[in-house]
Structures are given as structure tokens and as C-alpha cells.
């Protein structure tokens, strides 16, 4: 009715301000979008945590650069490994909109998986979700030709049973 048209108009204006198509909200395309489903990678464990495949990456003379310091046209740090040991908000965009960041990340020797927080004060559900995000981004980057080194973390012993999921045995971590 009239109220739903009003609401739809507000939503359409909001999304036009952030460059999201409002027709995407009601379309079948959104429901089937891989960035919505996040199901394109093989999963492991009870929660189907995406698998970051083992890769051989030379660990000699590693240099690191924070994700917040990478450049579009890197010249001096191409042999560096990108890390995410930063506040989560500085790399949240990689989860929400990963594709536009690919070319920037491809310039570097390798990329660590993003270390989304697993604070002990967080509900276990959020810790599992952040572990899923860590591995999904790693699998996504690998599927786009980027060398990835998985990172792992845990809060308390209750997180041990899922924090290793999605990392192939024998991987450098």
C-alpha cells in the first residue's frame, strides 16, 4: 500500500546515496549473489569454514606492510606481505566489497588473511563468524591468483575446536 511505497522510496534514496541499486533489494539476483551466499568455496568442519589452500611461499627476507598503507601503484614495497593486524574497521571493506581491492593486492608478494577480532568477550557465534570471514577472504584472494598465508587466532579454549578449520595441514601460518 501507500506505506510500503513510502518506505521503498526512503530505501531507494538511501541506497542511491551509497551507490547500491535499489532494484537489487527485491531481485532474484541479490538472493543468488555469491557475495550474499558466500558459498563458492569448499568448507571444512561443522560450520563449513572455507578452506585456504596450502601454498609454497618463500619465507626468506619477509617484509610486511599494513593493509592501511598499501597503494594503487606500488613501487617500493612490491616484495612485501600485506598484513591485517589492525583495527577491524580499517579492512572491513575487503569483506563487504572485495573485488575492487584485487588489483591493489596483486602487486604484493603475498597477503595474510584478515585477522578479524576474536575477543573473549564476544559471543562464540561472532568468533565463528569472524573465523569464517578470515578464511573466506583468503579463499577468495587465492581464487583470484593472489598468494595467501593464513592467519589463525583464538579467544579461549572453547574456540580451539573451530579456529583451525579452513587451513590445510602443513600450511605456513
Explain the meaning of each model-derived region.
Residues 27-102, 122:
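Non-catalytic, usually N-terminal nucleic-acid engagement modules in DNA/RNA processing proteins
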Residues 7-26, 30, 36:
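Eukaryotic low-complexity, non-globular regulatory regions
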Amino acid at each position: 500500500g501507500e506505506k510500503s511505497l513510502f518506505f521503498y522510496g526512503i530505501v531507494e534514496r538511501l541506497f542511491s546515496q551509497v551507490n547500491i541499486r535499489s532494484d537489487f533489494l527485491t531481485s532474484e539476483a541479490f538472493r543468488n549473489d555469491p557475495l550474499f551466499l558466500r558459498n563458492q568455496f569448499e568448507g571444512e568442519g561443522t560450520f563449513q569454514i572455507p578452506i585456504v589452500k596450502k601454498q609454497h611461499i618463500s619465507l626468506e627476507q619477509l617484509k610486511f606492510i599494513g593493509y592501511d598503507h598499501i597503494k594503487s601503484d606500488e613501487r617500493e614495497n612490491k616484495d612485501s606481505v600485506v598484513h591485517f593486524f589492525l583495527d577491524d574497521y580499517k579492512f572491513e571493506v575487503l569483506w563487504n566489497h572485495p573485488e575492487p581491492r584485487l588489483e591493489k593486492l596483486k602487486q604484493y608478494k603475498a597477503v595474510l588473511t584478515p585477522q578479524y577480532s576474536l575477543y573473549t568477550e564476544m559471543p562464540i557465534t561472532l568468533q565463528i563468524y569472524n573465523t569464517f570471514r578470515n578464511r573466506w577472504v583468503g579463499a577468495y584472494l587465492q581464487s583470484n591468483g593472489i598468494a595467501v598465508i593464513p592467519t589463525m587466532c583464538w579467544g579461549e579454549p572453547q574456540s580451539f575446536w573451530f579456529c583451525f578449520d579452513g587451513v590445510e595441514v602443513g600450511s605456513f601460518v
